[in-house]
């Protein structure tokens, strides 16, 4: 029974991680679109929606989330065995 609880916790974490990943990807796509509109149409979607520094910050935040997710998943696996 505890093994199924560990698996359900793992899948909840995986679901949360996937949603966070999709949010980061959406922001990155918005940044690419913002750059494309600013470059080719000279009408940015918003002046400071995302800059190249924001790309680095979002990638850094995603890296931190990935490491935290892996640590939590490893802790759940160790607890189960």
Swiss-Prot record:
Keywords: Host membrane, Membrane, Transmembrane, Transmembrane helix. GO terms for cellular component: host cell membrane; membrane. It is a multi-pass membrane protein. The chain crosses the membrane at residues 10-30, 56-76. It is found in: Host membrane. Its main location: host cell. This is Uncharacterized protein ORF81. It comes from Acidianus two-tailed virus (ATV).
